[in-house]
Amino acid sequence: MTIDDTKLQEFLGKAVSDLGATVSSTLVVVGEKLGLYQALAESGPLNSHELAEKTGILERYAFEWLNNQAAGGYIAYDSKANKYYLPEEQKACLADKDSPTYLPGSFQSFLSMAKDEEKVTKAFKEKQGIHWGDHHCDLYEGVERFFRTKYLANLISNWIPSLDGIEEKLRDGIHVVDVGCGHGSSTIIMAKEYPNSKFVGFDYHPESIKTATQRAQDAGVSDRVSFEVSDSTNFSGSYDFATVFDALHDMGNPHGAAKQIYKSLKKDGSWMIVEPFSSDKPRENHNPIGRMFYGASATVCVPCSIAGNGPGLGAQAGPTRIGDVVKSGGFTKFRVATQTPMNIIYEANP
């Protein structure tokens, strides 16, 4: 077959860009851990000698790091002054840990997937799964930080108000269960905003529950939040409102989880399901966000589900498949409540 040289060069250009992005992901994590972005944000324009002095690293490393970041557009370079700086937009994404657009946690989580390449290759080859607890430890912290920024930006201001009557009930005081709570960021955000309500978070990963419990104490919400180790199919209690954040598609038994949530809800209860944004048609997911989620799905989400003998819904399951799971649990009402570029928020009722 004849190769179209123009198309070949276009593809090679894309691949080179991806190679640069791959290695730069490591340097984003390095930059956060060593306070390099923070130094630029606090001090203004710096050259490599000044950055090295402020952060205690070798100047040669500072020089290479600065130019990698400038080449990728993550920082800016003033050639006349020979200094590097963080524009305000990049400050919000790389130096402000409380910003809803803060990114280094995302890089930490996705970089952890590369550290598990041998496990992923084995899972592919041997048609087996990878349990959540068998991944590199950076995944747990990175995923929580990745999700937390989205929850801070949207959960209270957008997602909960999109549900039928839930916000008012939360302010009055109800019982809430957060299934698959991980490190508890979603649970704690809700507990801070709705102090009259009581919250319980369940997760089958003991280390995550230990972390969540400590973070609830640190946040001063332990009086209304508790965390327990439990599988999504057999947790205890009766609730007015249930939530599952970015976890249903990972589960080994999502249908069983839906049945247990249905069983645990009161007759007038409601279930909010937060899932990665996805269309039912794979072709419509062939974009930068879909690419990111399919990558996470192939390395983490589907292997996690398969490890539990699950259906492997994946991070791009789409509304129809999620709806089928929800309805299999006994729910009669299911709708898209709202959406963002990164998430779809569903509401289900008995």
Summary of predicted features, one role per range:
Residues 57-68:
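Short amphipathic alpha-helical interaction segments
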Residues 40-44, 191:
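Short helix-to-turn junction characteristic of helix-turn-helix DNA-binding domains
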Residues 2, 6, 17-22, 28-33, ...:
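Conserved Class I S-adenosyl-L-methionine-dependent methyltransferase catalytic core
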Residues 255-267:
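A short glycine-rich, Lys/Arg-flanked "PGG" loop and its adjoining helix->strand segment in the class I
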Residues 112-249, 254-256, 272:
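Conserved adenosyl
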Residues 50-53:
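A short acidic, leucine-rich amphipathic alpha-helix
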Residues 274-328:
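C-terminal alpha-helical "lid/dimerization" subdomain adjacent to the S-adenosyl-L-methionine
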Residues 329-350:
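Core SAM-dependent methyltransferase catalytic element
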